[in-house]
């Protein structure tokens, strides 16, 4: 990057001048309940056509213009246009659980007939004045006036042939600019003002998208890369492909924010795949472009997995919401041609990170309507956001929860391939509970303004006047811009075309208008020469009052009321006008460097007669820091720069959110951007490390209230600044820098956050500072003065010898006059000499420093968490040794070389009894009662082995400065039983009377004294005694002998097992896929158990290290300060590293647990899939299964079918009843069972009758053989009976035979009829 220009990375002539760094991360899935979708009418859809026409994958057949509250839909043979409010009402009033409610024609909804039209794309222009439609059969692109369509007029104002268009994308702001993309992977720009197309803007392009303001477009290519273009064809930025993808093309792009893109990639093989089952392997990435050319690819997989109409190739539809407080910075809704559900991505304001939202309640998700015709899922052909709703919603959250109602909510419309519409309201619970409306809903309410409204920041963008509309050409003429050449063939980029010859006839009279011709400079509102008045309004010279509301800047002004055409379009934040109308400042910069640099990133605008896209506002014209644009009186733009910040040229200023605005303000800052509200203001030194809040780990002297980071001013421990030199002296004796703090070296680390009582005494005593450690070194003269005046400096300085009487009297006096002395001490100046009775610490309620009877809320060396809330910025150079948080307050000084040697040692005062005495219940900060020349104990309470030495401190003097209620050291410092009693049982207690006197004076009992201060006592005495010699009756006599039996070794660290040594898991499942998932699940579980085992071992080791008692074998001295500091810093680094390690491990464990849950769910899913593949019945059940309102509708349909079946069975039963098989006289209606019984009986009777006939036949044949006439006499009585039963009279044999045959046939026919009837009844049953 150019060191002279920090914005060299943004140089438009070198899109990748700064290089690029590419990283890839994973976007996590989040289960949420704060967001939900609710249908306008559960189970209701609106049908716009009953056609079954097949549509291409790249269809977009529904659009909404929120400014005009209009919708348009393309269906076979019709364009349907009307009011969105009536469309919402028609769906709310529709019938439930009906295949589709037909949208009827009305006064506000028109079905414009267009015979043989088969549309694949429809859309509005940015201001809603025109409707653009494309017929994928005839390849005709048609433009209609919206007003004409509302009057049911099918006359187009423009029509041209464009073969194989797959994308028609109007500019969201510029009303007459449209992107066209065809199957040849070419991208063109169509100007609706001239109906002309230039040479391809880009080739090998697979998708395109406008920025939210339409100043730039981004084009994706078949190699996976993307590029940002201006409408003039200038490349602003090149975006590489994700590192993990190869042989993928850019399938869909949505430009969400300035530097945020949601992009879908698909395999290259799907471009040429024409099979019925194309591959569905799309990948979703959220691309974040950093200020320094860094690209981060957040992988989100595919939020809309292919569980739907899988016969269609992947094509995604994206709609988004922005800046919905309190936490939704961006909400992206995604639909996929191969998915039946909608996916959701969100960017959080608080976390500043993307996530895939998984709505926990399945009934609150959004899905496409089910296709009853095909008995399968439908596929989307459009996804649109609607901000025009006006009805308030009652009980939006829950019938029992507040609020009772809420403002209208955004609506997302989904149009499927069966021309059915379904709509869902988007409920954001956090915003509803706080009564926060979606901002664009409020903007639409004010849409009656004459200018285009910017939804996200209420900017007013001027739109072309109706009289200056280019669509006034008499289209009845046979001449057409496309009559002489093809739309795509014979143009060269930059070649002079009819594009420059504007249509300037008036709409009503056909007269020539004054609207400037596209590509020619406009004299009206032209930028004047610097220092000269403008042509309109006579803007005065800088500093004089402006005329006609003009800016006081005399250059670069523009007229907000000017009627503009496409070629002369200006944003209210734009700079110079089109063509040659450039500011002198920009010309000067351009001519000096030969190319635009720093203030003019774009190249010089050409004055040729070709297609002049330079007239479109550039990004760097959005907000000129030099005042080259006239800004409206109420500037609502989110981009406001300080004097030392510049706008990046390659950034499209489409985002008005606070976050990105403040990132822009920090473009020239060394501090990393943050989402907090204090960005761009006073940024403290810790902001780059801890983002929103500075978090120095152990800097006790810093406060967030003090923000004067002024060189040359240092901060004292008393909260006041002291003028010092900017350059600090080099630390003496190689003292380590920043031993306990992550703060800069000029910040104090051990300064008190509250002024102490000795502030007045030490304010003028400026000593040489050790700037990195916060240790104050006293000069020898200062020590001599302190020694002469017997002035005590905390608990760390050597106290001069005092006689018995003076010490006792001073102790009693100091206890009696403590509060009075505190007040007098606070008022003293450095010139006054403190008295001997003046205490060093202020224990009053007004200015507390040390509190010994209550644990501190944040101990000085707490490793739990750093102090971040109540720290004050202090400088070390003014740190006095009287500060209770300085090292001297703990009896610790720097190395021996800068510290004056003590003038007297008390080795001669060692009594004969000293060898038998040891310390009991000694607090871990022993330096409070030790001489500064002796070795102090470690901060963790351990002691090192050193030769026995004498420690002498005036007891009465020590007790004098500590009030009664503050003398409990045990509540502040943990006790450690480090001593035992002496073995000499015959020794007397020479100081018993002294001890009793002290205890009685202070009101302590002997037991209480054992808990308050350190004592010396022989083995034989049950009391705590003070042991002294005759020579030093008022000194503690102490000797510590080495005791090896007290030392306990630290708890050893057990060996940790490695994940690499973990054996592979095995599964007993037989199915291969289930076996694989089972092994993966078990492997994760074993690894997780091993990780927990290792963590427990480490925790046990740490607990053992902190709780293992050990004897102090060596006494610390002030000379060991540097070593102790280094050890403490190393320990701090270790603890910090371990804390970070534990945090990382915890995150990994949480991630593993989440993975286990997902694997378990995936296992169940795979099991179901295998079952579905092997069980046709289960597969049918899965096809019938739908979620949410769709399931209710289908369930009702199933119930209706069941009712029909039952009704049919009832009808059949009625028909069987009507058969009336017997007892016709009483009209008895037999049942099926009774009929079967009757049939059995009839069959039995027929069998008996048949036997009788056979017997009769046999007798007749026997009689006939005798050739005799059968007479009455020749017949037996049985035969006569049979004849009578059969109704046969006496006749000849022939007559008998004929009658027999007729009777037999009749009975056989009757039996066959009954049998057939029963058979039919059984089949019906």
From Swiss-Prot:
Modified residues (Phosphoserine): 1041, 1043-1044
Ranges of biased composition (kind: Polar residues): 763-778, 792-801, 816-835, 850-861
A GO cellular component annotation in the UniProt record: nuclear envelope
MF-aspect GO terms: nuclear localization sequence binding; structural constituent of nuclear pore
Pfam families in the record: Beta-prop_NUP159_NUP214
Gene3D superfamilies: YVTN repeat-like/Quinoprotein amine dehydrogenase
Sequence ranges of Basic and acidic residues compositional bias: 779-791, 802-811, 867-881
Ranges in coiled-coil conformation: none
Major localization listed first in the record, in broad terms: cytoplasm
Keyword terms of this UniProt record: Cytoplasm, Nucleus, Phosphoprotein, Transport
Comp. bias intervals (Acidic residues): 927-937
Source species, domain of life: Eukaryota
Residues with Phosphothreonine modification: 899, 946
Region (Disordered): 1-20, 453-474, 758-951, 973-994
A GO biological process held by the record: RNA export from nucleus
InterPro entries, per the entry: Nucleoporin, Nup159/Nup146_N, WD40/YVTN_repeat-like_dom_sf
Compartments where found: Cytoplasm; Nucleus
Role according to the record: Functions as a component of the nuclear pore complex (NPC). NPC components, collectively referred to as nucleoporins (NUPs), can play the role of both NPC structural components and of docking or interaction partners for transiently associated nuclear transport factors. Active directional transport is assured by both, a Phe-Gly (FG) repeat affinity gradient for these transport factors across the NPC and a transport cofactor concentration gradient across the nuclear envelope.
The protein, known as: Nucleoporin nup146
